Amino acid sequence: MELRHLRYFVAVAEEGHITRAAERLGIQQPPLSQQIKAIESELGVQLFRRKARGVELTDAGKTFLEDARTTLSQLERAFEATRRTARGEQGRLCVGVTSTAPFHPLVPRAIRVFREACPMVSVTVEECLSNELIERLQGERMDVAFIRTSLSTRDGLVVNPLVKESMVVALPSVHVLAQGKRDAAIPFRRLANETFILYGPPGTGMYDATIAACQAAGFNPKVGNLGASTQQAPRIASTLSLVAAGLGVSCVPSSVQRMNMDGVVYRSLKGPAQPRALLSLASRRNDPSAVVRQFVNQFVNMVRKEAKGILSD
């Protein structure tokens, strides 16, 4: 028995008339009558009683109708689930973020819009440093990641630059530079004698951007592997905690100002050497997952539509 036989049987049962069922199915009446007889022959039972003006189900036919409808319904759900998966509208997606990425409004909005468009996709979000996110992507332990990196290419990955946002300096609230007007920008060179708390290890975008800005301003920041002036923090929360404790200052993306912490104030920077933090979306090159392609295409198209290219804040 084939799937079409179940559809033939259900159509005749619902119409109560072979001719009307044939019209509904788009086939001729004689072949449909033959198919119904073939089904009854295969089952070894009578499914319909012939009447003067149509047919009616026998008790055996009523039982078969219930199961036939269930089978067809289950198959239709399976077909639709398969189609959704092929379109990237069903499945799983693991999204990686650096601890600063969610502060930029694009990131939570991208995830929200995707979930609204593809509610059948199970989305999980994991937080790591950019270097760790890249390792997980390359190791196929993550699907996509919002990263802060100065590199536009990585082995086996596609890195889509999204946003270049200016960085601000986070200062202890008791710092002399924090006492001026809130909207007064600080010349970057005035940070030359400060102890810098760097976010992340060398090779991450914000670390490299801070070092480059200091050098462009004519000084080397007080950072290193030894000495009291050395401070590095793996997460933005720990970075700001060290700032609040008075252990130094830190350059952070301007969007991080949304994070209020007692003992920390933010000030914009001015001068020719202003650091900028690049936010990118990374994924594996030629990833076969339709869900990944759907997310990346949807997000990149959203950014391009809004900004005609890489965004600036």
Question: Where do the model's predicted regions map?
Answer:
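A late-sequence structural motif
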Residues: 198, 250, 255-256, 265-310
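Secondary-structure junction motif
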Residues: 104-107, 184-186, 194-221, 289, ...
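N-terminal winged-helix
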Residues: 29-30, 80, 86-118, 122-126, ...
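A short LG(V/I)-centered, amphipathic sequence patch enriched
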Residues: 40-59
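Hydrophobic hinge/microswitch elements
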Residues: 129-133, 138-142, 148, 201-267
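Short helix-boundary/capping micro-motifs
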Residues: 12-31, 44
